[in-house]
Amino acid sequence: MSSELPTEGTDLVNLVTVSSANWDAVVKTSELPVVVNFWAPWCPHSEKLAATFQSLSHRFIGRMKFARVNTDENKDLAARYGIMSVPTLLYFYQGRPYFQVIGDAPKHQLESEMDHILAQHKRCLSRSSERPE
């Protein structure tokens, strides 16, 4: 992946790279919805989505947090959330997953989904099930 992307735990405006060590602090305890990009460095679709994801993180500052998980380095997180393909975007609210997008998608599609999710996240949460830790 590109060397200009943030390293673990660093913040690039609204985009944080997370691991098992900081998962709870970044994702589980967030008051805002969090979208997590599960990616792998060997995947060209992950690399393509990275630029879109970073761009979208700027648009949603203060309304949604953005996080990245390298699945090669964090197999436990990928397994915990059933990530079978990269890239996968998994949306969380109050620490609970409630929506996912598998594969690369055009920016306008992701932006539209994110707007919809922000409008509906509390209702979506009431319909989601908590996954075991």
Per-region residue spans from a language model:
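Short pre-active-site segment immediately N-terminal to redox-active cysteine/selenocysteine motifs
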Residues: 31-32, 39-42, 85
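Typically the conserved alpha-helix immediately C-terminal to a functionally engaged Cys/Sec
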Residues: 45-60
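A short glycine-leucine-enriched loop at secondary-structure breakpoints
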Residues: 80-84
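Hydrophobic beta-strand anchors of alpha/beta hydrolase catalytic cores
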Residues: 35-36, 66, 89
